[in-house]
Amino acid sequence: MASAPTSKYNSHSLENESIKRTSRDGVNRDVGETLPRLPGEIRITDKEVIYICPFNGPIKGRVYITNYRLYLRSLETDSALILDVPLGVISRIEKMGGATSRGENSYGLDITCKDLRNLRFALKQEGHSRRDMFEILTRYAFPLAHSLPIFAFLNEEKFNVDGWTVYNPVEEYRRQGLPNHHWRITFINKCYKLCDTYPALLVVPYRASDEDLRRVATFRSRNRIPVLSWIHPENKTVIVRCSQPLVGMSGKRNKEDERYLDVIRETNRQVNKLTIYDARPNVNAVANKATGGGYESDDVYHNAELFFLDIHNIHVMRESLKKVKDIVYPNVEESHWLSSLESTHWLEHIKLVLTGAIQVADRVSSGKSSVVVHCSDGWDRTAQLTSLAMLMLDSFYRSIEGFEILVQKEWISFGHKFASRIGHGDKNHADADRSPIFLQFIDCVWQMSKQFPTAFEFNERFLITILDHLYSCRFGTFLYNCESAREKQKVTERTVSLWSLINSNKDKFKNPFYTKEINRVLYPVASMRHLELWVNYYIRWNPRIKQQQPNPVEQRYMELLALRDEYIKRLDELQLANSAKLSDPSASPSSPSQMMPHVQTHF
């Protein structure tokens, strides 16, 4: 990692950077063109502060606080700096120093962010400036604690594409060839009474009645019964997801659950066994028996094979990411980098998640066996495994729209607890439910995109933009824990979808090397020597670390694509003009060669 001198430090997301460049298109500015504002964004206050920059030292600036962001612009001519931080990114706000503090810049605020950076501001001790800033930031960064709406409900942005229409479950299952004579669509969960964390529409075995489903639900954690996620277009094997069975210490059984899994097995008669992947380490699954959970024993589920994938729980992942932050922010120790990275175990966890997904995909595609995937409750590791396996198996999900559908389906509609894992608008930064499960998934996708650079329609900016708005609270896409809660809060009616932003600006998020391929299965190499830390995400706030610059070939290719599009547009305009003249009898006849100048597209 090479160091680079820097005279200008812009600490904001890629997406926010694009806002500044296109501020004439819907982003208001006030206070002498210093503050960008979204429609619905209101300026609350501004103060002069000293920003304790961990890279360039103390910098005098003015900080503006709105109901959406903290925005700082330096007042020093020799140090141009901008900080643009959505308040949803803030995890914790602490006061530093006391009334008797005498050290230089020792009195102010410490701000911890969810996107791996910290901010420190020094303020004057007189005039209650710290108290005022602390109270305002706390009020708008943690609106739920103050009976205020999350900004997404105040955002008045308009886009020419409605992102809420991207995912229609009926259309997505129809794309997969469902329903068929083995699988049916049921609306038994229409009012979320069968399972309050599942979507309203489910795909289940044709031979299983709704009453069977109710009986199975009593034996699955949180009533999360086995339901279909994906079906192979050729061999008709399926990926089914669910939660753990409620076996308990006494080894309870449920005949309906056993028969139900057998029915799933019989929808595909190419193999005699149903494969069950339990995402947990074996010891954890056994320990869960003490709290009423457990796993499918071979002694009971005779026609099933059980494999444990050794992926650790949310608490282990949270601690691992904390260690990553410790080694990447604010400074990177070059001399001990490899050992420091290894000590975080982050890439080990990425490896285990990818390895598990590869096993699922391979068993379905090559092994021709249907698989059931679960962890404890089926909304964390299960979502990682099913969505990554589907990404490997189905090229549709590797397009921009397909990936959006994958996230909407496997993560959002099936109840990954975004509110609990991220803590949108919640001041309880130490909540044990916080965990970077979705970040891990996106990291795995990035690892795949590095190994298969032509297989994905989207680029790195697309993935980083998704992660930025996982925290920002600008859009309603990731709010709440489940579909029933979103319906209750009318999220699709009252907020804007992140996919509206992305699909209105698709060219920014396209991979120029994308080659569309049908039915190509991707098997990434999940060994430690093929995995790497995502520098452009985890270390992007450090201006001394040289970021991975766009490939010159990629830049030239993008220029040629833009040139081609311009030529095609001109050609269409000329053809339209020619048609109009041909249809006008009063117009003088012109030969095609006169009307159509020679256009060469370089392709």
Swiss-Prot record:
Residues 29-97 form the GRAM domain. The modification Phosphoserine is found at residues 13, 18, 588. Residues 163-538 form the Myotubularin phosphatase domain. Allosterically activated by phosphatidylinositol 5-phosphate (PI5P). Its main location: cytoplasm. A 1,2-diacyl-sn-glycero-3-phospho-(1D-myo-inositol-3,5-bisphosphate) binds at residues 288, 313-314, 376-381, 417, 421. Residues 583-593 have a biased composition (Low complexity). Belongs to the protein-tyrosine phosphatase family. Non-receptor class myotubularin subfamily. The GRAM domain mediates binding to PI(3,5)P2 and, with lower affinity, to other phosphoinositides. It is a peripheral membrane protein. Residues 1-13 have a biased composition (Polar residues). Keywords: Cell membrane, Cell projection, Cytoplasm, Endosome, Hydrolase, Lipid metabolism, Membrane, Phosphoprotein, Protein phosphatase, Protein transport, Transport. PANTHER family: MYOTUBULARIN, MYOTUBULARIN-RELATED. This is Myotubularin. A 1,2-diacyl-sn-glycero-3-phospho-(1D-myo-inositol-3-phosphate) binds at residues 288, 313-314, 376-381, 421. Lipid phosphatase which dephosphorylates phosphatidylinositol 3-monophosphate (PI3P) and phosphatidylinositol 3,5-bisphosphate (PI(3,5)P2). Has also been shown to dephosphorylate phosphotyrosine- and phosphoserine-containing peptides. Negatively regulates EGFR degradation through regulation of EGFR trafficking from the late endosome to the lysosome. Plays a role in vacuolar formation and morphology. Regulates desmin intermediate filament assembly and architecture. Plays a role in mitochondrial morphology and positioning. Required for skeletal muscle maintenance but not for myogenesis. Residues 1-32, 580-603 are annotated as: Disordered. The gene is MTM1. The modification Phosphothreonine is found at residue 495. It is found in: Cytoplasm; Cell membrane; Cell projection, Filopodium; Cell projection, Ruffle. Residues 14-32 have a biased composition (Basic and acidic residues). InterPro entries: GRAM, Myotubularin, Myotubularin-like_Pase_dom, PH-like_dom_sf, Prot-tyrosine_phosphatase-like, Tyr_Pase_AS, Tyr_Pase_cat, Tyr_Pase_dom. The active site is at 375 (phosphocysteine intermediate).
